[in-house]
């Protein structure tokens, strides 16, 4: 959500609602500049290893497609974010709108600013798509220079772009895509100049992200040059990007262009949006007068279609509307000033007004804090207790020096002892306090060694008694063992790869359709005919894997049903033969019981029950009659007489 606070007045911001507005954590604007190297090796198509995808693709083209896809995503989800594309190593030179013979060629040789750092327009998106997909269009621009490119010039060019186009952005990123791990060789002066320019970018607040690509005959080694110019973001900075480590492995060089694109895109997407702080530098109290400082992040949140801003479509180009709210009296249409507005509650028919200070005090439960109350084993934390989004916390050194060391010791202790801390948690001012479980989380890496989840602590809000509802009454029916055994083979064949669900492979179809429509409107494209739904089952593959097992299970189901039907109890509402009634009496003879007269047909039971219901005397009926009525209408007949009467009344009220 981009700059949502501009639609809210100061009084709305001060008098925050009790529920935390999680959408507000996405409001920081982001500026991303792609720096893509254009060299002979980067322009060489990589051989395809898949016979189904014979088309070859060069790393430069794959990187341009990454920039295009990211631009597509951000123009819809974050319309105020800026994205630019800088090509370096090109034969031509261009800086802003200057031609090859102007100052740009002299200042930044072999640097071609293809897309200026700005909010992408529809035409810029189309131009980038043409460069990435049209061979004729790319021939004029993607020509490698025979001379070496100074990385100091590239970094200084990026510095000028960020300074002039995004001077006040809190999040500024430079994405470098290259396969050259040592651009300057033994030239110490060029290496030193590049290091100085990288330090200038870091001091400016620009984060450099490297996306290395290995060559077929050479593995990319960041230690040769790039380790000296890339600075790790400080964890104490709440506006820093998510703490994802630099890729330990470079993008593969042996795969085809599509797999290379997928690898780059997934790597870029994982670092494309900074995870904003949910709360910053609040105290974590481990005991009396023993505090450290932590910041919290919201790493998981369900995405849903939402309005980022209002768009005016009446002009030649769509424009983002700046909202202004004015309060007007209903009867006189007079503009109401802020000091004239009062809030009141109804008590006994009268409105009792409260001052703003009194309203604030009503919602004030204390200063923001995370206070440890005690510790419990992880086994005492049930799975169903996780009812809200957990908060990821990480230490901060701003308020208390040494917080990282204490936090690390607590994290390791909770992991080793398999315990969770019970905490009193107030996330921010005016927020409702909650009891939460603070659980230590381990670091998780993917197959290529890239960090998926950082080590830290998770605060899981625990439900109060009012949040836990009673499960509806159901009757448990356990299937026979042969059916369970047959189904076990089916389930084993339908398991996902590595028995884990990857949400990135199954995007929300309704959300993607919503974005696709917005994208078509923004880029002046034809509206798509039908949505792409990757959540639909692959019926052919399912039939291929489990078809025989399903048929075998169906045969077993018929056999088990026949057995159950043959040995099942006889209903008292079905007319039976004299032989069945005689055998039932003989079976029951050793166990005498009080015989109760019941009706033998459904209509009879209906008449017997409905008449007392209309008179309000259902409780005078006997338990067997009530049970027979409930069984005849497919309702549960378990429980005491009071419960049976309530079920009968509920059924008859619906009729």
Swiss-Prot record:
Q: Does the keyword Oxidoreductase apply?
A: no
- List, alphabetically, the GO terms of the cellular component aspect: chromosome, telomeric region; Ku70:Ku80 complex
**Name this protein carries in UniProt:** ATP-dependent DNA helicase II subunit 1
* Localization annotation: Nucleus; Chromosome, Telomere
EC number of the protein? 3.6.4.12
- The broad enzyme category this protein falls into is hydrolase
Keyword set includes Hydrolase: yes
The ranges of region (Disordered) come to 1-26, 568-589
Q: Quaternary arrangement and interactors, per the entry?
A: Heterodimer of Ku70 and Ku80.
What GO molecular functions are on record for this protein? ATP binding; ATP hydrolysis activity; damaged DNA binding; DNA helicase activity; double-stranded DNA binding; telomeric DNA binding
Quote the function comment for this protein. Single-stranded DNA-dependent ATP-dependent helicase. Involved in non-homologous end joining (NHEJ) DNA double strand break repair. DNA-binding is sequence-independent but has a high affinity to nicks in double-stranded DNA and to the ends of duplex DNA. Binds to naturally occurring chromosomal ends, and therefore provides chromosomal end protection. Required also for telomere recombination to repair telomeric ends in the absence of telomerase. ku70, of the ku70/ku80 heterodimer, binds to the stem loop of tlc1, the RNA component of telomerase. Involved in telomere maintenance.
Q: Which family does it belong to?
A: Belongs to the ku70 family.
């Amino acid at each position: 959500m981009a700059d949502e606070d501009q639609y809210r007045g100061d009084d709305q911001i001060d008098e925050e609602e009790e529920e935390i507005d999680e959408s507000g954590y996405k409001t920081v604007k982001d500026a991303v500049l792609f720096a893509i190297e254009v060299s002979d090796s980067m322009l060489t198509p990589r051989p395809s290893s898949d016979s189904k995808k014979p088309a070859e693709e060069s790393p430069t083209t794959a990187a341009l497609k990454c920039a295009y896809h990211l631009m597509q995503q951000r123009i819809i989800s974050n319309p105020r974010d800026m994205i630019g594309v800088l090509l370096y190593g090109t034969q031509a030179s261009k800086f802003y709108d200057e031609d090859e013979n102007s100052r740009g060629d002299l200042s930044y040789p072999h640097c071609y600013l293809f897309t200026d750092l700005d909010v992408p327009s529809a035409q810029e998106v189309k131009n980038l798509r043409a460069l990435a997909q049209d061979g004729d269009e790319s021939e004029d621009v993607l020509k490698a220079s025979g001379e070496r490119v100074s990385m100091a010039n590239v970094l200084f060019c990026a510095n000028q772009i960020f300074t002039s186009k995004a001077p006040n952005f809190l999040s500024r990123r430079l994405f470098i895509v290259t396969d050259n791990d040592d651009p300057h060789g033994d030239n110490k002066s060029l290496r030193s100049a590049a290091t100085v320019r990288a330090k200038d970018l870091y001091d400016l607040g620009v984060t450099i992200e490297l996306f290395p690509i290995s060559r077929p005959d050479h593995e990319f080694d960041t230690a040769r040059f790039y380790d000296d110019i890339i600075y790790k973001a400080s964890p104490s900075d709440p506006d820093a990007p998510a703490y994802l480590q630099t890729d330990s492995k470079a993008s593969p060089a042996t795969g085809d262009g599509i797999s290379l694109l997928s690898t780059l895109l997934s790597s870029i997407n994982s670092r494309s949006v900074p995870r904003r702080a949910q709360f910053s530098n609040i105290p974590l109290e481990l005991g009396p007068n023993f505090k450290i400082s932590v910041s919290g992040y919201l790493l998981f949140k369900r995405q849903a279609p939402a309005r980022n801003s209002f768009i005016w479509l009446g002009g030649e180009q769509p424009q983002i509307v700046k909202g202004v709210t004015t309060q007007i009296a209903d009867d006189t249409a007079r503009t109401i000033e802020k000091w004239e507005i009062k809030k009141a509650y109804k008590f006994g028919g009268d409105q009792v007004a409260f001052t703003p200070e009194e309203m604030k005090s009503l919602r004030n439960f204390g200063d923001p804090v995370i206070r440890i109350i005690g510790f419990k084993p992880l086994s005492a934390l049930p799975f169903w207790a996780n009812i809200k989004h957990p908060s990821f916390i990480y230490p901060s050194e701003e308020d208390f020096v040494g917080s990282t060391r204490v936090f690390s010791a607590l994290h390791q202790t909770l992991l080793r002892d398999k315990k969770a801390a019970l905490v009193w948690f107030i996330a921010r001012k005016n927020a409702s306090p909650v009891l939460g479980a603070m659980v230590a989380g381990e670091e998780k890496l993917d197959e290529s060694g890239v960090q998926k989840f950082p080590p830290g602590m998770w605060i899981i809000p625990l439900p109060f008694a009012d949040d836990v509802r009673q499960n509806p009454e159901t009757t448990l029916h356990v299937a026979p063992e042969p059916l369970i055994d047959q189904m076990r083979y089916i389930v084993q064949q339908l398991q996902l790869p590595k028995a884990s669900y990857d949400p990135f492979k199954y995007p929300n179809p309704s959300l993607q359709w919503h974005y696709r429509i917005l994208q078509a409107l923004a880029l002046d494209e034809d509206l798509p005919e039908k949505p792409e739904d990757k959540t639909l089952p692959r019926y052919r593959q399912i039939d291929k894997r489990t078809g025989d097992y399903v048929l075998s299970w169906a045969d077993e189901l018929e056999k088990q049903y026949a057995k159950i039907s043959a040995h099942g109890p006889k209903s008292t509402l079905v007319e039976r033969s004299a032989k069945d009634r005689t055998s039932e009496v003989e079976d029951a003879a050793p166990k005498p019981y009080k015989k109760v007269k019941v009706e033998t047909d459904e209509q009879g039971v209906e008449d017997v029950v409905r008449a007392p219901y209309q008179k309000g005397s259902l409780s005078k009926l006997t338990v067997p009659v009530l049970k027979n009525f409930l069984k005849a209408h497919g309702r549960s007949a378990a429980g005491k007489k009071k419960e049976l009467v309530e079920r009968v009344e509920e059924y008859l009220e619906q009729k």
